[in-house]
């Protein structure tokens, strides 16, 4: 089967990009590719043949129909207007046309200098490409909207960051790379007609059902807000901290995008800061819902030339509704509740308080809770708490709440185990794979990818364990 590519972004939004070719790396070689995703997309196996060099995965060749561009956008970074940004090291190679008529962006990260590189070198490093590949695939298999990773190429090109690292490229796939920052760019350039063109493009290609509706723009922004709310709810329930929620890292389609200084909670710490550059804690775990709303308000401002203020405010209210509704549903599922009762939030908050006091492991606590039996006053979870009396008091109330529902243990446990993962991408697991890969051993990278494809399967190895001493509080930054 021949892959078919289109260039809708390039053809329809000429003011939003610069056309250019990738700059290949020295002695580039394919070290990992997503065989499952490649099969789904009918990508010929021959494209991954190492005897052909790095090929399209390393920017050495293009596939028929590809028309590479680097996109321009702007944004607020850490709450401050940063002006023009753009694809400083990434190039949108083309949009794959799928059988159902939809498209999928092929975006090559680390593809070399662009007009938007600013003071950067246009490169990505092996460390960051491995982290993004693992994180995006982990999120996908957790059921959270995200970009996807298709391939990683390593090289002999040295790249200077805090230390000298190895240059690499990541092929990232997404339904769209349209960001809040695209709209901000033209709004602050006082080109409202181009802001409206972006909205028209989004509606035409992703919400065509509203194309001929008079209030299409208000309906569209309402859905953007709702998708963002549901996404943030998913992050909070699984314990994911993005680390750098700048407006240019926010997806119009409600996808998790731009994995940098992210982290999944180990110990439950609502004030967890994943990014060691975030000195004020703006993007700490428990502030993500507020930041997402702030970012939506910045997007709403760009839409004021063609959406009434009342409609924008209604959409922002929709964000709050979607966030709280989805979060409530997810947390009830994590606790094994099939109905909503007035004391559920209090019960959840009591558990969170206990976990925060004791430094309980977020993922393991909920996974162990999913094995609870209504009639048993004992729980393996009890042994993880120092204050047994406090846990016992909470657990008695929890079991009493379970008994208010006519659901047997087997069904409830099954539901809980579908939403409480046994495995998440802890930073130490990613670091172990990175350390091996930097020594030329890709086995752990491949093994970890396989493990992350089955996050809801119980394991008795260290992929499901708490981090070792060296793996606690690993510092990560925006440098990639």
Swiss-Prot record:
GO molecular function, one term: ATP binding
Catalytic reactions of this protein: L-seryl-[protein] + ATP = 3-O-(5'-adenylyl)-L-seryl-[protein] + diphosphate; L-threonyl-[protein] + ATP = 3-O-(5'-adenylyl)-L-threonyl-[protein] + diphosphate; L-tyrosyl-[protein] + ATP = O-(5'-adenylyl)-L-tyrosyl-[protein] + diphosphate; L-histidyl-[protein] + UTP = N(tele)-(5'-uridylyl)-L-histidyl-[protein] + diphosphate
Classification lineage: Bacteria, Pseudomonadati, Pseudomonadota, Gammaproteobacteria, Enterobacterales
Cited NCBIfam families: adnlytase_SelO, PRK00029.1
Binding site for ATP: 86, 88-89, 109, 121-122, 172, 179, 258
Function noted in UniProt: Nucleotidyltransferase involved in the post-translational modification of proteins. It can catalyze the addition of adenosine monophosphate (AMP) or uridine monophosphate (UMP) to a protein, resulting in modifications known as AMPylation and UMPylation.
Amino-acid positions noted as binding Mg(2+) in the UniProt annotation, renumbered to this chain: 249, 258
Catalytic residues (UniProt): 248 (proton acceptor)
Enzyme class: transferase
Identification of the protein by name: Protein nucleotidyltransferase YdiU
InterPro entries, A to Z: adnlytase_SelO, SelO
EC identifiers of the protein: 2.7.7.-, 2.7.7.108
Alphabetized UniProt keyword annotations: ATP-binding, Magnesium, Manganese, Metal-binding, Nucleotide-binding, Nucleotidyltransferase, Transferase
Family: Belongs to the SELO family.
Organism: Salmonella agona (strain SL483)
Cofactor(s) needed: Mg(2+); Mn(2+)
């Amino acid at each position: 089967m021949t892959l078919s590519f289109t260039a809708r972004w390039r053809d329809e939004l000429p003011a939003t990009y610069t056309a250019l070719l990738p700059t290949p790396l020295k002695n580039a070689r394919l070290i990992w590719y997503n065989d499952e995703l490649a099969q789904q997309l009918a990508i010929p196996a021959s494209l991954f043949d190492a005897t052909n060099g790095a090929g399209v995965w390393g920017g050495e060749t293009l596939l028929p129909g590809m028309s590479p561009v680097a996109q321009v956008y702007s944004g607020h970074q850490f709450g401050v207007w940063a002006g023009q940004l753009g694809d400083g090291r990434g190039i949108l190679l083309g949009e794959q046309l799928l059988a159902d008529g939809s498209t999928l962006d092929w975006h090559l990260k680390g593809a070399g200098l662009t007009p938007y590189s600013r003071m950067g070198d246009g490169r990505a490093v092996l460390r960051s490409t491995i982290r993004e590949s693992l994180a995006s695939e982990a999120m996908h298999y957790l059921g959270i909207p995200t970009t996807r990773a298709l391939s990683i190429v390593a090289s002999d090109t040295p790249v200077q960051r805090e230390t000298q690292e190895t240059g690499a490229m990541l092929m990232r796939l997404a339904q769209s790379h349209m960001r809040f920052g695209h709209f901000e760019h033209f709004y602050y350039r006082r080109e409202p007609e181009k802001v409206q063109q972006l909205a028209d493009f989004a509606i035409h290609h992703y919400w065509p059902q509203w194309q001929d509706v008079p209030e299409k723009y208000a309906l569209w922004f309402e859905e953007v807000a709702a998708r963002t709310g549901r996404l943030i709810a998913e992050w909070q329930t699984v314990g994911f901290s993005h680390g750098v929620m700048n407006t240019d890292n926010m997806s119009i389609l409600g996808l998790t995008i731009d994995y940098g200084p992210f982290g999944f909670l180990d110990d439950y710490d609502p004030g967890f800061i994943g990014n060691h550059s975030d000195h004020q804690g703006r993007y700490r775990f428990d502030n993500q819902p507020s930041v997402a709303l702030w970012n939506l308000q910045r997007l709403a401002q760009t839409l004021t030339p063609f959406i009434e203020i009342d409609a924008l405010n209604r959409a922002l209210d929709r964000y709050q509704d979607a966030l709280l509704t989805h979060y409530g549903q997810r947390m009830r599922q994590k606790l094994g509740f099939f109905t909503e009762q007035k004391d559920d939030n209090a019960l959840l908050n009591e558990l969170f308080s206990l976990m925060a006091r004791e430094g309980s492991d977020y993922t393991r606590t909920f996974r162990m809770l999913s094995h609870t039996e209504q009639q048993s006053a004992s729980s393996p979870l009890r042994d993880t708490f120092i204050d047994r009396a406090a846990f016992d008091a909470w657990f008695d109330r929890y079991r009493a709440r379970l008994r208010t529902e006519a659901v047997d243990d087997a069904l409830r446990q099954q539901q809980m185990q579908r939403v409480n993962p046994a495995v998440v991408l802890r930073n130490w697991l990613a670091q172990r794979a990175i350390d091996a890969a930097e020594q030329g051993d890709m086995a752990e990278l491949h093994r970890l990818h396989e493990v992350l494809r089955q996050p809801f399967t119980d394991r008795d190895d260290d992929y499901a364990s708490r981090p070792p001493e060296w793996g606690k509080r690993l510092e990560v930054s925006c440098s990639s």
